[in-house]
UniProtKB/Swiss-Prot annotation:
<protein>
    <recommendedName>
        <fullName>Protein LURP-one-related 17</fullName>
    </recommendedName>
</protein>
<dbReference type="InterPro" id="IPR038595">
    <property type="entry name" value="LOR_sf"/>
</dbReference>
<comment type="similarity">
    <text>Belongs to the LOR family.</text>
</comment>
<dbReference type="Pfam" id="PF04525">
    <property type="entry name" value="LOR"/>
</dbReference>
<dbReference type="InterPro" id="IPR025659">
    <property type="entry name" value="Tubby-like_C"/>
</dbReference>
<feature type="region of interest" description="Disordered">
    <location>
        <begin position="1"/>
        <end position="20"/>
    </location>
</feature>
<dbReference type="InterPro" id="IPR007612">
    <property type="entry name" value="LOR"/>
</dbReference>
<comment type="function">
    <text>Might be related to the phospholipid scramblase and tubby-like superfamily of membrane tethered transcription factors.</text>
</comment>
């Protein structure tokens, strides 16, 4: 569908390969195998009247989409599959607060209606120190397993503006997702910052990885 964005998934070799003694570092619908999944993320909706994202796999096929009709500070975002079915819903927890925070809910699409559980599966909070100009920190956000978990499961560090981020599983101190500037192999072709790679390790849900990208975009764009 998108041949100009087609690429091969990068395999895991050497020190990046998951150890057999390590526990699974993800949640739901995890990929199985020894290769990373590399998705191309395009910060553009397929609908003319919307802002959003288009996510493409290594074969150039549409995998995820986000169509946002609210052009300024949306309170809610929905990650959909290629057919427009809701997968994950992200809801801003408070409208007025110093710390930007979101709940991530599993969405069940029933007869065209999206049903949302009462409690979020995941909770993401922007690092408060990022709002203090005198303090430098490479940690962008913290990800918790639910809104009542006091200890974060993941940290996100790096620079979203430069499209250079890592999502690290805290208990294992292991990078499970990377956001990278898209590598160009064809001479004369250059992608802007709105097109980048999302590299997801086996054992981590690609849908959750994309949901975290959406929230980074809300917090740091």
């Amino acid at each position: 569908m998108f041949p100009f964005l087609k690429q091969r998934s990068r395999s895991v070799h050497g020190e990046d390969a998951p150890s057999s003694t390590e526990s699974t570092v993800s949640v739901a619908a995890a990929d199985i195998g020894g290769a990373c999944t590399t998705l191309t993320v395009w910060r553009k909706s397929l609908l003319v009247s919307c802002e959003g994202f288009t996510v493409i796999d290594s074969n150039g096929d549409l995998i995820y989409r986000v169509d946002n009709y609210a052009r300024t500070r949306p309170e809610e975002l929905i990650l959909m599959d290629k057919d427009g079915n809701s997968l994950l819903l992200m809801h801003r927890t408070k409208k007025i607060t110093l710390v930007d925070s979101w709940g991530i809910y599993e969405a069940n699409d029933t007869k065209g209606e999206t049903k949302i559980p009462k409690c979020p599966t995941w909770y993401m909070r922007k690092n408060l120190k990022m709002n203090i100009l005198s303090t430098k920190s490479d940690i962008l956000a913290y990800v918790y397993s639910g809104s009542f978990d006091k200890k974060n499961s993941y940290i996100i560090k790096g620079s979203y503006r430069c499209k250079s981020c890592k999502i690290v599983h805290v208990p294992l101190n292991k990078t499970v997702v990377e956001i990278k500037r898209k590598e160009v192999r064809t001479k004369g072709v250059r992608f802007g910052s709105d097109v980048f790679d999302l590299v997801v390790n086996p054992g981590f849900d690609t849908g959750l990885a994309m949901a975290l990208v959406l929230l980074l975009d809300q917090m740091f764009s």
